[in-house]
Amino acid sequence: MDKINYYLLFVITITLCVITLGAYVRLSHAGLGCPDWPGCYGYLVGIPDNSLEIIAAESIYEGSKVDIMKAWKEMIHRYLAGFLGIFIFIISFIFYKKSSYNLFKLSFFISLFVIFQAALGMFTVTLKLQPVIVMFHLVGGLIIISLLWLLFLRYNSNSFFEKNSFYSKTKISKKEIKSLSILSYVTLFFLIMQIMLGGWTSTNYAALACVDFPKCNASWWPQMDFYNAFFVELATNLNYEFGRLDSPARVAIHFTHRLWAIFAGLIIIILAFKSYKLLKVPYQKFLSLILVLLLFFQILLGVLNVKMSLPIYIAVLHNGNAALLLICLVTQLYFIYTTKKNI
Protein backbone atom coordinates (compact mmCIF):
# COMPACT_ATOMS: atom_id res chain seq x y z
CA MET A 1 0.00 0.00 0.00
CA ASP A 2 1.15 3.54 -0.68
CA LYS A 3 1.16 6.53 1.68
CA ILE A 4 -2.31 7.67 0.59
CA ASN A 5 -3.74 4.29 1.56
CA TYR A 6 -2.19 4.51 5.01
CA TYR A 7 -3.46 8.06 5.41
CA LEU A 8 -7.00 7.06 4.36
CA LEU A 9 -7.01 4.17 6.84
CA PHE A 10 -5.69 6.50 9.54
CA VAL A 11 -8.53 9.00 8.89
CA ILE A 12 -11.12 6.19 8.85
CA THR A 13 -9.79 4.95 12.20
CA ILE A 14 -10.01 8.46 13.67
CA THR A 15 -13.57 8.72 12.34
CA LEU A 16 -14.51 5.50 14.13
CA CYS A 17 -12.95 6.92 17.31
CA VAL A 18 -15.00 10.12 16.96
CA ILE A 19 -18.20 8.07 16.47
CA THR A 20 -17.58 5.89 19.52
CA LEU A 21 -16.45 8.86 21.63
CA GLY A 22 -19.61 10.73 20.59
CA ALA A 23 -21.66 7.74 21.72
CA TYR A 24 -19.79 7.72 25.03
CA VAL A 25 -20.43 11.46 25.53
CA ARG A 26 -24.14 10.98 24.82
CA LEU A 27 -24.52 7.87 26.98
CA SER A 28 -22.65 9.42 29.92
CA HIS A 29 -25.08 12.38 29.74
CA ALA A 30 -22.31 14.84 28.86
CA GLY A 31 -23.97 16.17 25.69
CA LEU A 32 -24.74 19.45 27.45
CA GLY A 33 -21.50 19.48 29.44
CA CYS A 34 -20.82 22.73 27.61
CA PRO A 35 -23.88 24.96 27.05
CA ASP A 36 -22.30 26.91 24.18
CA TRP A 37 -20.49 26.12 20.93
CA PRO A 38 -17.71 25.88 19.74
CA GLY A 39 -16.22 26.83 23.09
CA CYS A 40 -17.12 25.69 26.58
CA TYR A 41 -18.50 28.44 28.83
CA GLY A 42 -16.70 30.87 26.51
CA TYR A 43 -13.36 29.00 26.60
CA LEU A 44 -12.07 27.82 23.22
CA VAL A 45 -9.14 26.08 24.90
CA GLY A 46 -9.82 24.26 28.14
CA ILE A 47 -12.76 24.79 30.48
CA PRO A 48 -13.43 26.80 33.66
CA ASP A 49 -11.70 24.70 36.30
CA ASN A 50 -11.14 26.86 39.38
CA SER A 51 -13.74 28.29 41.74
CA LEU A 52 -13.58 31.86 40.40
CA GLU A 53 -13.88 30.75 36.77
CA ILE A 54 -16.75 28.40 37.62
CA ILE A 55 -18.67 31.12 39.48
CA ALA A 56 -18.16 33.54 36.58
CA ALA A 57 -19.24 30.92 34.01
CA GLU A 58 -22.39 29.98 35.93
CA SER A 59 -23.34 33.64 36.30
CA ILE A 60 -23.08 34.17 32.54
CA TYR A 61 -24.82 30.92 31.55
CA GLU A 62 -27.81 30.98 33.86
CA GLY A 63 -29.31 27.60 34.65
CA SER A 64 -26.04 25.78 33.87
CA LYS A 65 -23.93 24.09 36.51
CA VAL A 66 -20.30 23.48 35.57
CA ASP A 67 -19.50 19.76 35.70
CA ILE A 68 -15.79 19.51 34.98
CA MET A 69 -15.84 15.83 33.95
CA LYS A 70 -18.79 16.28 31.58
CA ALA A 71 -17.30 19.46 30.13
CA TRP A 72 -13.97 17.75 29.40
CA LYS A 73 -15.71 14.78 27.77
CA GLU A 74 -17.60 17.12 25.46
CA MET A 75 -14.56 19.24 24.60
CA ILE A 76 -12.27 16.26 23.91
CA HIS A 77 -14.92 15.00 21.50
CA ARG A 78 -15.05 18.42 19.81
CA TYR A 79 -11.26 18.69 19.57
CA LEU A 80 -10.95 15.24 18.02
CA ALA A 81 -13.81 15.98 15.61
CA GLY A 82 -12.11 19.26 14.66
CA PHE A 83 -8.84 17.50 13.85
CA LEU A 84 -10.80 14.91 11.86
CA GLY A 85 -12.34 17.69 9.77
CA ILE A 86 -8.87 19.03 8.97
CA PHE A 87 -7.65 15.53 8.05
CA ILE A 88 -10.61 15.11 5.66
CA PHE A 89 -9.97 18.50 4.03
CA ILE A 90 -6.38 17.35 3.45
CA ILE A 91 -7.70 14.28 1.60
CA SER A 92 -9.57 16.56 -0.82
CA PHE A 93 -6.41 18.59 -1.35
CA ILE A 94 -4.38 15.43 -2.04
CA PHE A 95 -6.75 14.21 -4.76
CA TYR A 96 -7.00 17.71 -6.21
CA LYS A 97 -3.19 17.83 -6.54
CA LYS A 98 -3.17 14.34 -8.08
CA SER A 99 -5.78 15.46 -10.65
CA SER A 100 -7.91 12.45 -9.71
CA TYR A 101 -11.19 14.09 -10.71
CA ASN A 102 -13.62 11.36 -9.63
CA LEU A 103 -11.87 10.80 -6.31
CA PHE A 104 -11.64 14.55 -5.74
CA LYS A 105 -15.40 14.91 -6.32
CA LEU A 106 -16.16 12.30 -3.68
CA SER A 107 -13.61 13.66 -1.20
CA PHE A 108 -14.88 17.22 -1.74
CA PHE A 109 -18.45 16.06 -1.09
CA ILE A 110 -17.26 14.41 2.14
CA SER A 111 -15.60 17.69 3.14
CA LEU A 112 -18.86 19.58 2.56
CA PHE A 113 -20.73 16.94 4.55
CA VAL A 114 -18.27 17.42 7.43
CA ILE A 115 -19.23 21.11 7.54
CA PHE A 116 -22.90 20.10 7.66
CA GLN A 117 -22.07 17.61 10.42
CA ALA A 118 -20.34 20.36 12.41
CA ALA A 119 -23.48 22.50 12.09
CA LEU A 120 -25.55 19.60 13.44
CA GLY A 121 -23.09 19.37 16.33
CA MET A 122 -23.68 23.04 17.08
CA PHE A 123 -27.48 22.66 16.93
CA THR A 124 -27.24 19.58 19.17
CA VAL A 125 -25.98 21.90 21.92
CA THR A 126 -27.88 25.12 21.16
CA LEU A 127 -31.21 23.27 20.79
CA LYS A 128 -30.46 21.30 23.98
CA LEU A 129 -30.35 17.76 22.56
CA GLN A 130 -33.40 18.09 20.31
CA PRO A 131 -33.95 14.39 19.38
CA VAL A 132 -34.25 14.78 15.61
CA ILE A 133 -31.04 16.86 15.49
CA VAL A 134 -29.13 14.40 17.69
CA MET A 135 -30.35 11.46 15.60
CA PHE A 136 -29.23 13.03 12.32
CA HIS A 137 -25.91 13.98 13.94
CA LEU A 138 -25.40 10.32 14.87
CA VAL A 139 -26.38 9.12 11.39
CA GLY A 140 -24.19 11.81 9.83
CA GLY A 141 -21.12 10.36 11.51
CA LEU A 142 -21.92 6.92 10.10
CA ILE A 143 -22.44 8.41 6.63
CA ILE A 144 -19.03 10.09 6.81
CA ILE A 145 -17.18 6.89 7.75
CA SER A 146 -19.07 4.98 5.03
CA LEU A 147 -18.12 7.56 2.39
CA LEU A 148 -14.49 7.56 3.53
CA TRP A 149 -14.44 3.77 3.24
CA LEU A 150 -16.02 4.02 -0.22
CA LEU A 151 -13.27 6.48 -1.16
CA PHE A 152 -10.69 3.94 0.03
CA LEU A 153 -12.32 1.20 -2.06
CA ARG A 154 -12.47 3.39 -5.16
CA TYR A 155 -8.84 4.44 -4.76
CA ASN A 156 -7.89 0.75 -4.63
CA SER A 157 -10.29 -0.45 -7.33
CA ASN A 158 -7.48 -1.59 -9.64
CA SER A 159 -5.75 -3.73 -7.03
CA PHE A 160 -9.07 -5.15 -5.80
CA PHE A 161 -10.41 -6.07 -9.20
CA GLU A 162 -7.98 -6.08 -12.10
CA LYS A 163 -4.86 -7.49 -10.41
CA ASN A 164 -6.87 -10.29 -8.84
CA SER A 165 -8.77 -11.02 -12.06
CA PHE A 166 -11.96 -10.55 -10.09
CA TYR A 167 -14.29 -10.60 -13.06
CA SER A 168 -12.76 -13.68 -14.68
CA LYS A 169 -13.32 -15.59 -11.43
CA THR A 170 -16.88 -14.35 -10.95
CA LYS A 171 -19.03 -16.74 -12.98
CA ILE A 172 -22.35 -15.01 -12.59
CA SER A 173 -25.05 -14.11 -15.11
CA LYS A 174 -26.34 -10.59 -15.71
CA LYS A 175 -29.73 -11.60 -14.32
CA GLU A 176 -28.17 -12.95 -11.12
CA ILE A 177 -25.97 -9.91 -10.53
CA LYS A 178 -28.92 -7.59 -11.21
CA SER A 179 -31.08 -9.31 -8.59
CA LEU A 180 -28.15 -9.31 -6.17
CA SER A 181 -27.62 -5.59 -6.80
CA ILE A 182 -31.27 -4.77 -6.07
CA LEU A 183 -31.14 -6.89 -2.92
CA SER A 184 -28.00 -5.10 -1.72
CA TYR A 185 -29.61 -1.66 -2.08
CA VAL A 186 -32.75 -2.84 -0.29
CA THR A 187 -30.55 -4.23 2.49
CA LEU A 188 -28.74 -0.90 2.77
CA PHE A 189 -32.10 0.87 3.15
CA PHE A 190 -33.20 -1.52 5.91
CA LEU A 191 -29.91 -1.14 7.78
CA ILE A 192 -29.95 2.67 7.57
CA MET A 193 -33.54 2.72 8.84
CA GLN A 194 -32.51 0.44 11.72
CA ILE A 195 -29.61 2.73 12.58
CA MET A 196 -31.96 5.73 12.55
CA LEU A 197 -34.38 3.88 14.82
CA GLY A 198 -31.48 3.09 17.13
CA GLY A 199 -30.54 6.75 17.16
CA TRP A 200 -34.15 7.71 17.87
CA THR A 201 -34.24 5.18 20.71
CA SER A 202 -31.08 6.60 22.23
CA THR A 203 -31.92 10.29 21.84
CA ASN A 204 -35.35 9.79 23.40
CA TYR A 205 -33.82 7.82 26.31
CA ALA A 206 -35.90 4.77 25.41
CA ALA A 207 -33.14 2.15 25.56
CA LEU A 208 -34.54 0.77 28.83
CA ALA A 209 -38.22 1.38 28.08
CA CYS A 210 -38.45 -2.42 27.82
CA VAL A 211 -36.73 -3.96 30.81
CA ASP A 212 -36.76 -7.59 29.67
CA PHE A 213 -36.13 -9.70 26.57
CA PRO A 214 -37.61 -11.17 24.38
CA LYS A 215 -40.80 -9.83 25.94
CA CYS A 216 -41.23 -6.13 26.62
CA ASN A 217 -42.25 -5.39 30.20
CA ALA A 218 -43.58 -8.96 30.58
CA SER A 219 -45.78 -8.59 27.49
CA TRP A 220 -45.50 -9.58 23.82
CA TRP A 221 -47.46 -6.43 22.91
CA PRO A 222 -47.14 -3.81 25.68
CA GLN A 223 -49.06 -0.56 25.94
CA MET A 224 -47.61 1.81 23.33
CA ASP A 225 -48.18 5.35 22.04
CA PHE A 226 -46.92 5.38 18.45
CA TYR A 227 -48.23 8.86 17.62
CA ASN A 228 -46.16 10.69 20.24
CA ALA A 229 -43.28 8.25 19.81
CA PHE A 230 -42.59 9.47 16.28
CA PHE A 231 -43.99 12.99 16.46
CA VAL A 232 -41.18 15.44 15.75
CA GLU A 233 -41.38 18.32 18.21
CA LEU A 234 -39.59 21.40 16.87
CA ALA A 235 -39.69 23.59 19.97
CA THR A 236 -36.43 25.51 20.43
CA ASN A 237 -36.88 26.60 24.06
CA LEU A 238 -37.01 23.18 25.72
CA ASN A 239 -34.32 21.04 27.31
CA TYR A 240 -34.51 17.45 25.99
CA GLU A 241 -31.83 15.95 28.25
CA PHE A 242 -33.14 12.68 29.73
CA GLY A 243 -36.13 12.84 27.37
CA ARG A 244 -39.59 14.39 27.49
CA LEU A 245 -41.79 11.47 26.34
CA ASP A 246 -43.99 9.45 28.66
CA SER A 247 -43.51 5.71 29.14
CA PRO A 248 -45.92 4.36 26.43
CA ALA A 249 -44.22 6.53 23.77
CA ARG A 250 -40.75 5.36 24.80
CA VAL A 251 -41.92 1.75 24.79
CA ALA A 252 -43.26 2.24 21.24
CA ILE A 253 -39.87 3.55 20.08
CA HIS A 254 -37.96 0.70 21.72
CA PHE A 255 -40.41 -1.94 20.45
CA THR A 256 -40.25 -0.59 16.88
CA HIS A 257 -36.45 -0.75 17.01
CA ARG A 258 -36.71 -4.42 18.02
CA LEU A 259 -39.26 -5.29 15.33
CA TRP A 260 -37.31 -3.57 12.55
CA ALA A 261 -34.18 -5.40 13.72
CA ILE A 262 -35.89 -8.69 12.81
CA PHE A 263 -36.57 -7.57 9.23
CA ALA A 264 -33.17 -5.90 8.82
CA GLY A 265 -31.40 -8.96 10.23
CA LEU A 266 -33.25 -11.38 7.95
CA ILE A 267 -32.53 -9.39 4.80
CA ILE A 268 -28.83 -9.06 5.74
CA ILE A 269 -28.65 -12.85 6.17
CA ILE A 270 -30.36 -13.38 2.80
CA LEU A 271 -27.90 -11.01 1.09
CA ALA A 272 -24.92 -12.70 2.74
CA PHE A 273 -26.18 -16.17 1.76
CA LYS A 274 -26.84 -15.20 -1.88
CA SER A 275 -23.48 -13.41 -2.15
CA TYR A 276 -21.68 -16.42 -0.67
CA LYS A 277 -23.44 -18.72 -3.12
CA LEU A 278 -23.18 -16.65 -6.32
CA LEU A 279 -19.85 -14.82 -5.99
CA LYS A 280 -17.01 -17.31 -6.40
CA VAL A 281 -14.10 -15.16 -5.21
CA PRO A 282 -12.72 -16.29 -1.80
CA TYR A 283 -12.62 -12.84 -0.20
CA GLN A 284 -16.23 -12.27 -1.27
CA LYS A 285 -17.22 -15.40 0.64
CA PHE A 286 -15.16 -14.19 3.59
CA LEU A 287 -16.92 -10.81 3.45
CA SER A 288 -20.32 -12.53 3.55
CA LEU A 289 -19.28 -14.43 6.67
CA ILE A 290 -17.99 -11.26 8.34
CA LEU A 291 -21.32 -9.54 7.57
CA VAL A 292 -23.25 -12.30 9.36
CA LEU A 293 -20.83 -12.38 12.31
CA LEU A 294 -21.12 -8.61 12.80
CA LEU A 295 -24.91 -8.92 12.59
CA PHE A 296 -25.08 -11.57 15.33
CA PHE A 297 -22.62 -9.63 17.48
CA GLN A 298 -24.84 -6.55 17.10
CA ILE A 299 -27.91 -8.54 18.15
CA LEU A 300 -26.01 -9.91 21.16
CA LEU A 301 -24.98 -6.40 22.20
CA GLY A 302 -28.58 -5.20 21.86
CA VAL A 303 -29.84 -8.01 24.09
CA LEU A 304 -27.07 -7.36 26.64
CA ASN A 305 -28.03 -3.67 26.73
CA VAL A 306 -31.45 -4.70 28.04
CA LYS A 307 -30.40 -7.63 30.23
CA MET A 308 -27.59 -5.66 31.91
CA SER A 309 -29.50 -2.34 32.18
CA LEU A 310 -27.47 -0.45 29.58
CA PRO A 311 -23.86 -0.65 30.79
CA ILE A 312 -22.03 2.14 29.04
CA TYR A 313 -19.28 -0.03 27.51
CA ILE A 314 -21.85 -2.36 25.91
CA ALA A 315 -23.89 0.58 24.60
CA VAL A 316 -20.77 2.21 23.10
CA LEU A 317 -19.79 -1.11 21.49
CA HIS A 318 -23.33 -1.33 20.06
CA ASN A 319 -22.77 2.03 18.35
CA GLY A 320 -19.28 1.17 17.11
CA ASN A 321 -20.33 -2.22 15.78
CA ALA A 322 -23.19 -0.56 13.86
CA ALA A 323 -20.52 1.48 12.05
CA LEU A 324 -18.53 -1.68 11.22
CA LEU A 325 -21.68 -3.44 10.01
CA LEU A 326 -22.49 -0.51 7.73
CA ILE A 327 -18.92 -0.43 6.38
CA CYS A 328 -19.07 -4.16 5.65
CA LEU A 329 -22.37 -3.76 3.81
CA VAL A 330 -21.01 -0.81 1.81
CA THR A 331 -18.05 -3.00 0.79
CA GLN A 332 -20.37 -5.78 -0.34
CA LEU A 333 -22.55 -3.32 -2.24
CA TYR A 334 -19.51 -1.75 -3.93
CA PHE A 335 -18.18 -5.10 -5.12
CA ILE A 336 -21.61 -6.11 -6.42
CA TYR A 337 -22.09 -2.76 -8.17
CA THR A 338 -18.65 -2.89 -9.79
CA THR A 339 -19.14 -6.49 -10.90
CA LYS A 340 -22.51 -5.59 -12.45
CA LYS A 341 -20.96 -2.64 -14.28
CA ASN A 342 -18.17 -4.75 -15.79
CA ILE A 343 -20.01 -7.95 -16.78
Summary of predicted features, one role per range:
Residues 2, 93-108, 176, 272-291:
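Membrane-interface helix-loop-helix junctions at transmembrane boundaries of multi-pass membrane enzymes
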Residues 24-34, 118-138, 201-212, 250, ...:
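Interfacial helix-loop-helix junctions of multi-pass membrane proteins
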Residues 72-89, 132-144, 252-270, 315-324:
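Membrane-interface loop-to-helix entry segments
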Residues 30-73, 207-249:
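Extracytosolic (periplasmic/ER-lumenal) interhelical loops and adjacent juxtamembrane/interface segments
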Residues 82-96, 143-156, 263-276, 325-337:
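Membrane-interfacial alpha-helical segments at the cytosolic side of multi-pass membrane proteins
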Residues 157-181, 341-343:
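Membrane-interfacial, low-structure loops and terminal tails that flank and connect transmembrane helices
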Residues 6-38, 189-201:
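N-terminal signal-anchor transmembrane alpha helix
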Residues 10-21, 105-123, 186-194, 286-304:
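Small-polar-interrupted transmembrane alpha-helices in polytopic inner-membrane proteins
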